[in-house]
A protein has these predicted regions:
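Amphipathic alpha-helical effector-binding/dimerization core
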Residues: 1-85
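Amphipathic alpha-helical regulatory segments at dimerization interfaces
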Residues: 11-22, 104-107, 111, 169-173
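Short glycine/serine/threonine/alanine-rich loop segments
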Residues: 25, 113, 176
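Sparse recognition of residues in long alpha-helices and their boundaries
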Residues: 56, 151-152, 179
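Cysteine/selenocysteine-centered motifs that mediate thiol-based redox chemistry or coordinate metal-sulfur cofactors
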Residues: 81-83, 164-184
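Conserved acidic, metal-coordinating active-site core of Asp-based
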Residues: 90
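Extended hydrophobic
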Residues: 94-167, 184
């Protein structure tokens, strides 16, 4: 049984708030919709310079850290099939082909997290990780958007570690939820 975005928001919001408080960076939850990802929950950083929630409600998955985390859960064949018409054009051209995307997703799978280096928006970087359902499939992505001025290698590592831990907590919460919390 699939969980609705509303149910996912209710189940995952406490951990989303906890990781936002820990990092004081903007954090978001994403779902895959075809070749796009959609933001269905987020909490903004309280810093003066911060990434805004819903800056992109829907974006090509290969352009966001959360989207790449979701794409990395698929096989290369699935990625090829879903992008049979090619990659949607976007104003940043860091990844320009399916072959380049597959190479990038290989790195994401190795590291356990995805990055976005100003690929969705100039001045914005991010880290994204997969959140797994009780059956082990990837359900949603958890990401943090960070102004590029704060996105040092050390900060990227710190954010990745916090998101990986939070995603594990979220997965455990999903595995332990009461069946009555499932929508439809």
């Amino acid at each position: 049984t699939l969980l609705s975005p509303r149910t996912l928001r209710r189940l995952l919001r406490p951990q989303l708030a906890a990781v936002q408080s820990l990092l004081n960076e903007t954090v978001n939850l994403w779902i895959l919709e075809g070749i796009y990802v959609r933001n269905f929950d987020g909490i903004e950083s309280t810093r003066e310079l911060a990434v805004r929630v819903n800056a992109y409600d829907r974006i090509p998955a290969y352009r966001s850290a959360g989207g790449k985390a979701l794409l990395a859960s698929l096989t290369n064949r699935e990625v090829e099939q879903m992008h049979a018409q090619g990659l949607p054009k976007w104003h940043s051209e860091r990844v320009t082909s399916i072959a380049a995307l597959k190479r990038h997703l290989h790195t994401v799978r190795q590291h356990g997290y995805a990055t976005n280096l100003e690929e969705a928006s100039l001045g914005v970087c991010g880290v994204g990780v997969a959140v797994h359902s009780p059956d082990g499939s990837t359900l949603v992505a958890l990401s943090s958007g960070v102004p590029s001025t704060r996105f040092s290698p050390a900060r990227r590592k710190e954010i990745a570690e916090a998101l990986i831990e939070s995603a594990s907590t979220m997965s455990a919460r999903l595995a332990g939820h009461d069946r009555s919390e499932i929508d439809g």
